[in-house]
C-alpha cells in the first residue's frame, strides 16, 4: 500500500539522530534475543512525523458526486468504502505502534530516557489518530451535504417528468384531430376512385375498336411480307453463287501467303541456329583463354611460394647454426627474438602474397562475368530483332487478310 511506503519515507535520518538517546555506560541487561529486540524496536528509529499527512483528502470546494444521476449512488458507495478502508488501515497501524512500544518498553525496562521517548511517541500517535478522526467526520459531513444535493436533483427530474407527461397529452390531442382530417380526405379519395373507374371503362371500349382495325391492317402487311420473302430468296441464291467464286480466290491467296510465311520462318530459324553456334564457339574460346590464364597465374604463384619456402629453410638453417655456436644465454635470447621477428615478417609477406593471389583471382572472375554478360546482352538483342521482324510480317499478313475481307464484303453487298 502507498501509506506504508509513506510511513517508511517519513522516518528520516535527521529525526532519528535527534531522538536517539545517549548510550549507557555499561551493557544492557537481559539476553541476546532481548537486545536484538531493543535494536529492532528502539524508539529512536521510529518516526515522530504526523501521520495525518499520509492520507490525501479532496478539498471541500470539489464535489464528490458527478452531474449524471445514474452513477451518483455507486460513486458515493465507493467513497464510503475508501473511508472505511483508511479507518481500518489507521487502526491496524495504531495497534502495530502499540505492539512496537510495548516491545520497546519490555526491552528497555529500567531506563528512564527510553521510557520518556516511548511516552512521547504514544502521545504523538494519539494526537495523529484524533486528527484523522476529525478529518473523517468532516468528510462524512461533506458526503451528507452531497446526498442532499442529489435529492434536490431527483426532485428536479420528477418535475421534468411531469412536464413531459403534460406535453405528451397535448400531442395525443393533436394526433386525434389529424386522424379526423385523414378520415375526411379518405372519403374524398373514394369519390375520385369511382369517377376514375367510369373513365377506365370508356377507354377499354375505344381500345377494342382500335384492336379490330389493327387486325385488318396486319393481314394486309402479312401478304406484302410474303411477297418480299420470295424476292429475298431469289437474291440470296444469286449471292451464294457469287460467294463460292470469291471463296475459291480467297483460298488461293491464303495458300500463297502461307507458303511465303513458312519460307520466312525457315530462314529466321536457320539464322538463329547459326548465331547460336557462333556464340557457343566464342564462349568456348573465351573459357579456354581464361583457364589458360588461371593456370599460368597458379603456376607462377606456386613457383613464388616454393622459392619463399626454400629461402625460409635456408635462413632457418643459418640461424640454427648460429644458435649452436652461441654459448651465452643472453646472446641466445637475442637470437630467439630475431628469429621471432623474421618469422613475423615472413608471415606478413605470406599473407600479402595470398591477398595478391586472391585479388588477381577476383579480377579474373570479374572479367569472366563481364564477358558472359556481354554475350548474353548480344543474344537478347538478336532475339528482340527477330521478334520485331516476326511482328512486322504478322502485321503485313493481317493487312492483306483485312483487304481480302473487305473485297469479299463488297462483293456480297454488290
Swiss-Prot record:
Residue ranges with Polar residues bias? 1-13
Keyword tags: Coiled coil
Q: Which residues form a coiled coil?
A: 70-94, 121-149, 188-223, 266-414
Is Ribosomal protein among the key words of this record?
A: no
Q: Which PANTHER family match?
A: PROTEIN FAM81A, PROTEIN FAM81B
* Family per record: Belongs to the FAM81 family.
Superkingdom classification of source: Eukaryota
Q: Name its species.
A: Bos taurus (Bovine)
**What name is this protein filed under?**
Protein FAM81B
Amino acid at each position: 500500500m502507498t501509506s506504508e511506503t509513506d510511513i517508511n519515507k517519513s522516518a528520516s535520518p535527521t529525526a532519528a539522530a535527534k531522538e536517539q538517546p545517549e548510550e549507557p555506560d555499561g551493557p544492557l541487561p537481559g539476553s541476546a534475543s532481548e537486545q536484538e529486540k531493543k535494536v529492532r524496536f528502539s524508539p529512536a528509529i521510529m518516526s515522530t512525523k504526523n501521520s495525518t499527512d499520509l492520507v490525501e483528502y479532496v478539498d471541500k470546494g470539489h464535489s464528490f458526486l458527478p452531474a449524471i444521476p445514474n452513477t451518483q449512488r455507486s460513486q458515493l458507495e465507493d467513497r464510503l468504502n475508501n473511508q472505511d478502508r483508511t479507518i481500518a488501515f489507521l487502526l491496524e497501524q495504531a495497534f502495530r505502534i502499540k505492539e512496537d512500544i510495548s516491545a520497546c518498553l519490555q526491552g528497555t525496562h529500567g531506563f528512564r530516557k527510553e521510557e520518556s521517548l516511548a511516552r512521547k511517541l504514544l502521545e504523538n500517535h494519539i494526537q495523529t489518530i484524533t486528527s484523522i478522526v476529525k478529518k473523517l467526520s468532516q468528510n462524512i459531513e461533506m458526503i451528507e451535504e452531497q446526498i442532499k444535493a442529489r435529492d434536490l436533483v431527483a426532485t428536479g427530474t420528477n418535475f421534468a417528468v411531469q412536464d413531459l407527461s403534460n406535453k405528451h397529452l397535448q400531442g395525443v390531442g393533436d394526433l386525434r384531430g389529424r386522424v379526423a382530417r385523414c378520415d375526411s380526405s379518405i372519403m374524398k379519395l373514394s369519390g375520385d376512385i369511382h369517377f376514375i373507374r367510369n373513365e377506365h371503362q370508356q377507354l377499354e371500349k375505344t381500345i377494342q375498336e382500335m384492336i379490330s382495325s389493327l387486325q385488318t391492317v396486319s393481314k394486309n402487311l402479312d401478304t406484302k411480307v410474303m411477297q418480299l420473302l420470295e424476292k429475298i430468296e431469289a437474291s440470296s441464291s444469286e449471292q451464294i453463287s457469287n460467294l463460292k467464286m470469291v471463296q475459291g480466290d480467297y483460298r488461293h491467296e491464303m495458300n500463297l501467303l502461307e507458303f511465303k510465311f513458312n519460307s520466312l520462318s525457315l530462314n529466321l530459324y536457320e539464322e538463329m541456329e547459326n548465331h547460336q553456334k557462333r556464340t557457343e564457339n566464342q564462349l568456348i574460346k573465351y573459357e579456354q583463354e581464361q583457364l589458360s590464364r588461371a593456370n599460368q597465374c597458379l603456376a607462377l604463384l606456386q613457383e613464388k611460394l616454393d622459392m619463399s619456402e626454400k629461402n625460409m629453410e635456408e635462413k632457418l638453417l643459418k640461424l640454427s647454426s648460429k644458435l649452436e655456436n652461441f654459448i651465452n644465454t643472453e646472446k641466445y635470447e637475442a637470437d630467439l627474438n630475431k628469429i621471432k621477428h623474421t618469422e613475423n615478417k615472413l608471415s606478413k609477406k605470406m599473407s600479402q602474397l595470398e591477398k595478391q593471389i586472391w585479388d588477381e583471382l577476383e579480377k579474373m572472375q570479374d572479367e569472366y562475368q563481364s564477358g558472359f554478360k556481354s554475350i548474353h546482352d548480344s543474344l537478347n538483342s538478336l532475339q528482340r530483332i527477330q521478334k520485331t521482324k516476326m511482328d512486322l510480317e504478322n502485321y503485313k499478313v493481317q493487312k492483306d487478310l483485312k483487304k481480302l475481307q473487305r473485297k469479299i464484303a463488297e462483293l456480297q453487298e454488290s
